[in-house]
């Protein structure tokens, strides 16, 4: 899950695209106790601090944003902390990644389960329901498909700890078990990487795929070889040449090739 979260962070730093002629609206609905406070629309900027582009009041569980957007990745920040009280970043302040486009968008969530700004293992976490943005729909679909790989890798990590690290610390010879689990883990990591590369190639015209490519070329993961990177670069050039995102991708591409 850390991988998914990281890729979400890098996406926020880097995405850009063209907008429609009309604007967007975000109609937010929160359920749960004390659903009153403030909401912010925040845009992350590459190598800079986040920028708050809009704010509004959350009243009786409802809030609204409207405007026009060119860069599609934003974050909805909901702050239900009362003035003067110690901020609670787990239960009263929430952060949701949103691929915003110029359309009518709805945001529905329960304050009891919205993902907090800071992760808390003891707290149930459930993403809000977001509708009306086709780009965000693609992002959600991708994460659902990735979940199979992530869950399997998490299980293998737990097995490695329980079946190898703990017994090994007790002086038991379990090296064969450890090697078997490690090989299985590498196999699933390769499967996950292949899925993500296939996704990038299939959706090269989408900001979601552009963000995934930037994530890997930023050094958090490593693509297989220079040929694979060059093929990916050619696909993006058709749709992104001349944009700020393309320029950043070029720089990351050059740096990554030097590392190989």
Sequence positions of predicted segments:
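Alpha-helical solenoid scaffolds that mediate protein-protein interactions
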Residues: 199, 216, 236-240
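Helix-turn-helix repeat elements of alpha-solenoid scaffolds
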Residues: 185-193, 223-230
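N-proximal helix/coil linker or "cap" segments that precede and/or mark the start of modular domains
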Residues: 228-260
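Amphipathic alpha-helical repeat scaffolds of TPR domains
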Residues: 175, 205-219
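A non-transmembrane, solvent-exposed segment enriched in polar/low-complexity residues
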Residues: 17-183
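Sec-dependent N-terminal signal peptides
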Residues: 4-13
């Amino acid at each position: 899950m850390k991988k998914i979260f990281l890729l979400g962070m890098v996406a926020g730093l880097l995405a850009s695209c063209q907008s429609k002629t009309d604007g967007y609206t975000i109609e937010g609905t929160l359920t749960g106790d004390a659903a009153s406070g403030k909401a912010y629309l925040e845009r992350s900027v590459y190598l800079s601090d986040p920028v708050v582009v809009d704010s509004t009041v959350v009243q009786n569980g409802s809030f609204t944003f409207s405007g026009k957007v060119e860069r599609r990745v934003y974050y909805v920040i909901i702050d239900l902390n009362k003035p003067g009280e110690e901020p609670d970043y787990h239960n009263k302040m929430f952060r949701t990644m949103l691929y915003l486009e110029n359309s009518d968008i709805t945001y529905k969530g329960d304050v009891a389960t919205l993902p907090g700004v800071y992760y808390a293992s003891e707290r149930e976490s459930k993403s809000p329901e977001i509708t009306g943005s086709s780009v965000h729909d693609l992002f959600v679909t991708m994460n659902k498909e990735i979940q199979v790989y992530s869950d399997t890798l998490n299980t293998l990590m737990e097995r490695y700890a329980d079946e190898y690290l703990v017994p090994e610390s007790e002086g038991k010879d379990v090296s064969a078990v450890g090697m078997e689990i490690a090989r299985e883990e590498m196999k699933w990591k390769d499967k996950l990487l292949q899925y993500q590369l296939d996704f990038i190639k299939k959706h090269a015209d989408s900001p979601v795929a552009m963000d995934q490519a930037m994530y890997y070329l930023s050094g958090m993961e490593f693509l297989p070889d220079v040929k694979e990177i060059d093929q990916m670069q050619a696909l993006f050039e058709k749709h992104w040449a001349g944009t700020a995102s393309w320029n950043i991708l070029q720089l990351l591409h050059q740096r990554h090739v030097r590392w190989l």
